[in-house]
């Protein structure tokens, strides 16, 4: 891990991108518009070998750091960002997401408790998203809330499009596995095994909008891939019936919206 220097920012934000020209500009603009004092947040974008106009789009902006990672894969790109990050909290989102203006403020507030090792946020979809997708999104948020708050490490999963981790966690247990998928889930699983006293929390105030999807069937197809790849995590267990019922009950009561 890179040595942490004095007077660091409070939060380092790491965003990998690969051929992300469709949404990258909106992502960068949302991060530059964050409610933050000068020097409080550093923005690190990592180009993972884009062949479209993504690099040119990123070059249009001042106030961000752009790095390059030749090893294919978003987790390799995230690890490159982690190595240079200077803040005690490292936050992650994706190039097809826009963050709320108070996103970093909510992350800082949510991680005030020193027992919180990692934080997962709330995901919305665009205004033109279908009703089934909005319902599916609410269910996924409810699922994250229940798993983070009530389930053991073996059941944990995470999404890097809205996630914050203490830098010390990477120093202690290592970076993301450079897998194609599920390394975010593996990281919080590994944190629970190595640092069981630390909490994984869900904070609905930490909000992003995921621009990639507008139809439920496309998102459901992606979720099936995540479910399949979670099986590569050593010791991972699928949710049991009682856990799934707890999620359903929480969702029916309005959780995740």
Cite the ranges covered by each PLM segment.
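A conserved hydrophobic helix/loop-capping motif in glycosyltransferases and polysaccharide synthases
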Residues: 11-23, 27, 34, 46, ...
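A conserved acidic beta->alpha catalytic loop
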Residues: 30, 47-56, 97
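Short, acidic, metal-binding catalytic loop of nucleotide-sugar glycosyltransferases
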Residues: 30-40
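Glycine-rich, basic loop-to-helix element that forms the pyrophosphate-binding segment
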Residues: 69-85
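Short aromatic/hydrophobic "clamp" motif used to bind/position activated sugar donors
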Residues: 90
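Conserved donor NDP-sugar-binding/catalytic core segment of glycosyltransferases
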Residues: 102-133
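A recurrent flexible, glycine/aromatic-enriched loop bordering the glycosyltransferase active site
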Residues: 125, 146-164, 180, 186
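Active-site-adjacent helix/loop segment of glycosyltransferases
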Residues: 200-203, 209-257
């Amino acid at each position: 891990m890179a040595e942490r220097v004095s007077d660091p920012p409070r939060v380092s934000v790491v965003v990998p991108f690969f051929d992300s020209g469709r949404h990258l500009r909106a992502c960068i603009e949302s991060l530059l518009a964050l409610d933050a004092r000068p020097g409080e947040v550093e923005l690190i974008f990592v180009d993972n070998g884009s062949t479209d106009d993504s690099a040119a789009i990123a070059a249009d902006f001042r106030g961000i750091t752009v790095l390059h990672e030749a090893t294919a894969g978003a987790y390799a790109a995230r690890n490159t960002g982690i190595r240079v990050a200077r803040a005690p909290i490292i936050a992650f989102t994706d190039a097809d997401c826009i963050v709320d203006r108070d996103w970093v403020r909510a992350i800082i507030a949510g991680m005030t408790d020193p027992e919180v090792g990692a934080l997962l946020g709330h995901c919305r979809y665009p205004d033109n998203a279908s009703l089934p997708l909005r319902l599916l999104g609410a269910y996924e948020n409810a699922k994250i809330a229940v798993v983070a708050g009530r389930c053991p490490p073996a059941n944990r999963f995470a999404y890097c499009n809205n996630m914050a981790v203490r830098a010390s966690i990477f120093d202690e247990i290592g970076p993301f596995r450079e897998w194609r998928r599920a390394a975010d889930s593996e990281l919080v699983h590994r944190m629970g095994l190595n640092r069981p006293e630390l909490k994984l929390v869900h904070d609905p105030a930490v909000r992003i909008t995921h621009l990639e999807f507008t139809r439920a069937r496309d998102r459901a197809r992606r979720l099936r891939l995540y479910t399949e790849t979670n099986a590569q995590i050593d010791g991972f267990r699928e949710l049991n019936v009682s856990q799934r019922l707890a999620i359903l009950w929480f969702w029916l009561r309005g959780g995740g919206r």
